[in-house]
């Protein structure tokens, strides 16, 4: 099972940003964008790894589940209830 989140911290104070907070920027060969490291980059890496494995083998070797949520930065208030309500669907190897 892979877990990831797509929410990000608030932009305030916006005047401290070196580039527009809602616009990806490349500086010195690095990507600067809200969520690019926490956690959208990790989520993207997981999807690309799955895609590469499927292209090479045609199937995944395990029963894989992916949970993506949008409340991690504020404590994931609904995640526990969601997992409890969907235990059978979330069963993975």
Question: What is each PLM-predicted segment?
Answer:
Residues 37-93:
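Acidic/histidine-rich catalytic neighborhood of metal-dependent amide-processing enzymes
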